[in-house]
UniProtKB/Swiss-Prot annotation:
Gene Ontology molecular-function annotations: ATP binding; guanylate kinase activity
UniProt xrefs under SMART domains: GuKc
Gene: gmk
Binding residue positions for ATP: 28-35
Protein name as it appears in the record: Guanylate kinase
Family under the similarity heading: Belongs to the guanylate kinase family.
Catalyzed reactions: GMP + ATP = GDP + ADP
Domain of life where this protein originates: Bacteria
Record-linked SUPFAM superfamilies: P-loop containing nucleoside triphosphate hydrolases
Keywords: ATP-binding, Cytoplasm, Kinase, Nucleotide-binding, Transferase
GO CC entries: cytosol
PANTHER family, per the entry: GUANYLATE KINASE, GUANYLATE KINASE-RELATED
Lineage: Bacteria, Pseudomonadati, Pseudomonadota, Betaproteobacteria, Burkholderiales
Compartments, as annotated in UniProt: Cytoplasm
């Protein structure tokens, strides 16, 4: 998320390929409502799919392997990392997370939009390889609201909540690196804003060109060279 991209190009890979699918990265401090918003977006938009990350953390109540995460061991994670299987990887709160490179590229080549629930460190890694990946940062309406949400969630011990709140400040400091910021004070409004971001991204010139190449060529419209 290091650079804003307003040149209208579609998703470019490290090797210069232009894919018809778009890559979205949703970043937020713990408790900001990221997962709830993402799940609501996915339920309303069948043209976007969620990348399922690998993680070494233990499943939370209700989480299923292969649906929410690919839960794995530290040893297996390190083996995959050494084999360069991950588009990005990071250690967050003592646990490892990684995103499958091959799966994402296959989806985008086939015209599917991909959404990553990711931390700011991982977003930086993705941006180096897909320079037009769209970063969306979800902010809480206040730090007090963030603390209240973490407590109501009932998933963490008090000491863990304290640690997450301390980390939130440094995480929020990376919001300027995103292309878009959504303040999750009113859920329906925040969801509508997410939908607008996705819709606008799909209308960028090169996204349209990649999806409707024959029409554009027939009309004499050509894809400009990236700078």
């Amino acid at each position: 998320m290091t650079q804003s991209t307003h040149d209208g190009h579609a998703a470019h890979s490290l090797h210069g390929g232009v894919y018809p699918g778009n890559l979205f990265m949703v970043v937020a401090p713990s408790g900001a409502g990221k997962s709830t918003l993402v799940n609501a977006l996915l339920s309303k938009d069948s043209d976007i799919c969620l990348s399922i990350s690998y993680t070494t953390r233990k499943p939370r109540p209700g989480e299923q392997d292969g649906q929410h995460y690919h839960f794995t061991t530290v040893e297996d994670f390190r083996t995959r990392h050494a084999a360069h299987e991950f588009l990005e990887s990071a250690e967050v709160h003592g646990n490892y997370y990684g995103t499958s490179r091959v799966w994402i590229e296959e989806q985008m080549k086939n015209g599917h939009d991909v959404l990553l629930e990711i931390d700011w460190q991982g977003a930086l890694q993705v941006k180096k390889q897909f320079r037009n990946a769209v970063g969306i940062f979800i902010l809480p309406p206040s730090l007090d609201a963030l603390e209240e949400r973490l407590k109501k969630r009932g998933q963490d011990e008090p000491k863990v909540i304290t640690r997450r709140l301390l980390a939130a400040g440094s995480e929020i400091a990376h919001a300027p690196e995103a292309e878009y910021v959504v303040i999750n004070e009113n859920f329906e409004r925040a969801l509508a804003e997410l939908e607008c971001i996705v819709a606008a991204t799909r209308l960028r010139f090169a996204s349209q060109y990649a999806r409707h190449t024959e029409l554009f060529i027939e009309l004499g419209i050509h894809l400009p060279h990236a700078e």
